[in-house]
């Protein structure tokens, strides 16, 4: 039953991110391109899967990532208005356009799913901080990529997205640390 709930949530997440991203680029596309939620999804899926087996957490995290990514790219058929071919062709084209990220999800999903299981099993503050820290570290990673590599100016066009993401991560980290301190005092 838990796996069904995770798959349903992953499906809704993928469709929602596609709709949020939209077809017009700009601010909405920048919000839709935030990566941290895509890593948080399998981590939460691994947590929901239970605490018995790391393998189960990894499997459920991988399935959640795959379902969400497929939902995202198939939803793009309608969000982006690709309706000139028969539906099976459209699905194939949509999934082919996401091959790079689907491959990444096949690795990151199981890794973060297993981390979710570890976090649940050990009530790990470190795993909770990692989850919150994703929102802080992503903008920094993009800045490093921009400065050191072939980064694009696109991510710098809407700094409010990255500042807000960092603030969300910092607030979450603060709440986790405060909660952990209170729990250790009691």
Language-model region placement:
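Residue-level signature of transmembrane alpha-helical entry/exit and packing/kink sites
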Residues: 2-6, 57, 93, 97, ...
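Short helix-perturbing small/polar motifs within transmembrane alpha-helices
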Residues: 3, 106-123
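Alpha-helical transmembrane segments of multipass membrane proteins
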Residues: 13, 17, 64-72, 108, ...
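Internal alpha-helical transmembrane segments of multi-pass membrane proteins
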Residues: 51-62, 117-137
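Membrane interfacial helix motifs at helix-loop boundaries and amphipathic/re-entrant anchors
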Residues: 15-39, 73-103, 139-165
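N-terminal topogenic module of multi-pass integral membrane proteins
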Residues: 1-61
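Hydrophobic cores of alpha-helical transmembrane segments in multi-pass inner/ER membrane proteins
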Residues: 38-48, 101-114, 165-178
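Membrane-interface capping segments at transmembrane-helix boundaries
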Residues: 1, 175-186
């Amino acid at each position: 039953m838990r796996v069904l709930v995770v798959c349903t949530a992953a499906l809704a997440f993928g469709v929602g991110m596609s709709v949020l991203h939209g077809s017009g680029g700009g601010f909405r596309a920048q919000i839709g391109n935030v990566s941290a939620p895509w890593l948080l999804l399998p981590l939460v899926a691994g947590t929901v899967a239970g605490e018995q087996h790391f393998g189960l957490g990894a499997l459920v995290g991988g399935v959640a990532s795959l379902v969400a990514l497929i939902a995202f790219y198939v939803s793009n058929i309608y969000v982006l208005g690709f309706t000139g071919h028969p539906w099976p062709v459209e699905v194939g084209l949509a999934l082919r356009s996401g091959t790079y990220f689907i491959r990444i999800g096949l690795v990151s999903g199981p890794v973060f799913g297993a981390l979710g299981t570890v976090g649940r099993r050990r009530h790990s503050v470190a795993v909770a901080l990692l989850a919150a820290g994703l929102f802080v570290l992503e903008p920094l990673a993009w800045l490093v990529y921009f400065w050191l590599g072939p980064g694009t100016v696109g991510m710098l066009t809407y700094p409010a997205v990255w500042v807000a993401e960092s603030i969300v991560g910092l607030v979450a980290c603060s709440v986790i640390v405060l909660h952990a301190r209170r729990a250790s005092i009691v």
